[in-house]
């Protein structure tokens, strides 16, 4: 354990109902209810619903698919998220659609129009929920030749104009991909280019931004903790956000990014090693306003596909000085 390090707790999570890149959960209503009970018990009170509509090569997936629930209480999985969030006192940020075909064809104006129509429809549909307090720009991590900054800017402008009562949120990644889809920006390049071409443009439109932290390796040599560069990211991005009046949060990813010597190929996203999570939390805590994660339901919950997720949750609670016995009380 680290001495004199005060960790901020994870106080929110994404909810990914369509893409199974971090594992297939096959949760039923009781499983979801237990997850919400657990989150409430440990201080997670924000839900960021990601990718509610997806399209690729003409194939579409929807969080409003009536086959997504096998219980009568909810017509679809998206209805359930809103209902349980209301019941357990959560704050919901709703993310929009994403069409890979639009992006690959360079039809970014259609992507903007699809987002506008989606938010018009869903804000009206779910506006009666008191928990519904924010909108989330889902498209956030594609390279320059897909015009993703133009899309995000126009969607944020539409949100602010048409839904001024809603807070706005994004979660792009540190070290975003360059146009070659391989190399990444270093921190100074990221702050300069993302600053000039995006964040300065959306000053006053974007309330909160939680960059995906990406750095996983808990670098250490003979017991001495080494600098892995993540602190520099928080410091320099924090300065940029302060100039743009954007509150700096962080998305501490709870899936394992491959790092040298770990023996896993890229694209394998199981739950994180608890030492990596400890490193991420200790570095971010003094420098950000809020910590959220991608994501509790498929990586930290005992309901996940991954066998050690229950133990990851137990180690996380120990980091915060909490008794992991609550896991057995809720999940048996």
Protein language model regions, located:
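Mature N-terminal, pre-catalytic/accessory segment of carbohydrate-active enzymes
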Residues: 1-49, 61, 129-132, 324-332
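Structural preference for beta-strand elements that scaffold enzyme active sites
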Residues: 7-14, 45-48, 89-93, 131-136, ...
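Aromatic-lined substrate-binding rim segments of carbohydrate-active enzymes
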Residues: 29-100, 147-170, 222-241
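Substrate-binding cleft of secreted/luminal carbohydrate-active enzymes
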Residues: 35, 46-48, 206-221, 236, ...
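Surface-exposed, active-site-proximal loop segments in enzymatic domains
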Residues: 55-74, 100-111, 260-267, 306-308
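An active-site-proximal structural segment forming one wall of the substrate-binding cleft
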Residues: 72-88, 107-134, 151, 155-158, ...
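Active-site groove signature of glycoside hydrolases
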Residues: 97-102, 118-148, 209-212
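Aromatic- and acid-rich polysaccharide-binding/catalytic face
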Residues: 130-143, 170-174, 190-227, 296-299
């Amino acid at each position: 354990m680290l001495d004199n390090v005060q960790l901020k707790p994870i106080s929110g999570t994404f909810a990914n109902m369509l893409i199974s890149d971090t594992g297939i959960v096959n949760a039923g209503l009781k499983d979801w209810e237990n997850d919400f009970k657990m989150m409430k018990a440990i201080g997670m009170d924000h839900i960021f619903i990601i990718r509610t509509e997806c399209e690729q090569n003409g194939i579409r997936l929807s969080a409003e698919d009536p086959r997504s629930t096998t219980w009568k209480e909810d017509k679809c999985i998206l209805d359930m998220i809103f209902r349980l969030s209301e019941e357990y006192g959560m704050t919901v940020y709703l993310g929009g659609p994403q069409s890979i075909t639009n992006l690959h064809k360079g039809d970014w104006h259609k992507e903007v129009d699809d987002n506008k129509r989606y938010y018009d429809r869903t804000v009206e549909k779910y506006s009666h929920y008191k928990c519904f307090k924010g909108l989330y720009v889902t498209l956030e991590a594609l390279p320059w030749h897909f015009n993703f900054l133009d899309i995000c800017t126009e969607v944020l402008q539409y949100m602010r104009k048409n839904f001024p009562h809603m807070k706005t949120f994004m979660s792009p990644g540190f070290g975003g991909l360059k146009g070659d889809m391989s190399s990444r920006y270093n921190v100074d390049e990221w702050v300069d280019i993302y600053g000039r071409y995006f964040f300065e443009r959306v000053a006053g439109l974007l309330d909160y931004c939680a960059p995906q932290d990406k750095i996983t390796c808990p670098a250490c040599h003979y017991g001495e903790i080494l600098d892995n560069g993540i602190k520099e990211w928080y410091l320099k991005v924090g300065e940029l956000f302060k100039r743009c009046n954007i509150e700096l949060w962080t998305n501490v990813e709870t899936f394992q990014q491959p790092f040298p010597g770990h023996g896993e190929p890229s694209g394998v996203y199981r739950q994180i090693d608890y030492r990596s999570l400890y490193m991420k939390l200790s570095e971010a805590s003094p420098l950000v306003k809020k910590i959220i994660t991608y994501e509790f339901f498929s990586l930290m919950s005992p309901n996940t596909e991954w066998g050690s997720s229950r133990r990851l949750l137990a180690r996380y609670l120990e980091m915060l000085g909490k008794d992991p016995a609550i896991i057995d009380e809720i999940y048996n």
